[in-house]
């Protein structure tokens, strides 16, 4: 009780219950009460009766996460259903990542320096606090198997082979079109040749980039995330990415693999988990220039819902 804290010499005490006040759709609109969108005013009354004062609702990033984005995993039974639940753009991003040789795996404490390095690069780029490698090692020690660190890497040889196949296929297509035009040119064939020639030039450029990437190593870290597992929800708590490898969509693939492994397929002892918590957003849905817009749009692509906390 609040009186107990006063007896212990507390000057000020803040509490932030992990309780939704109101469920909103992925664009911030409150759901109808018939769909569970009614505000939970009872919790405020209970806390006020205990002697606390509600500090009001705020938007923006604060020291305590006040807005979260989550996805209901109920009824999603396999990877195909999971993929179909995303936006078309996000589905494309995940398929694109796989076609470019990106693979996702869990890492242990012995590789946390790689995780921390990516996290630090992201913190410096996006101007948030970096907690340091020791923090993550202590987190892993405290949470044990419930803390999962995930790394997305580019298999450069696989990427090179994929780009070579695409360039070869386009080269064959262009050669075939040129042969047809040599026999009898039509406007349709010429237009198709121009289009595929442009695609071939782009494919050759990507192949040249893949050849350069091979020189950097066999496996190149592109993104990393940390998750906390529980029986009721899986929480996506920390993440980072290497800006240079943004076109590989590694972060999107990590999210998909996490939902698939930890929620749909489930791990012992939790099994299937019905809630995937993308964690913090700033609660600003209507400003395209907001600093948190990119984070929001990334999470919206997985078709979840937003909600304000106390």
Located regions from the model:
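A conserved beta-strand-loop-helix scaffold within acyl/acetyltransferase catalytic domains
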Residues: 20-22, 26, 34-40, 50-247, ...
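Short, polar N-cap/turn motifs at the start of nucleic acid-interacting alpha helices
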Residues: 305-309
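Acyl-donor binding region in acyl/amide transferases
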Residues: 1-61, 175, 222, 229-304
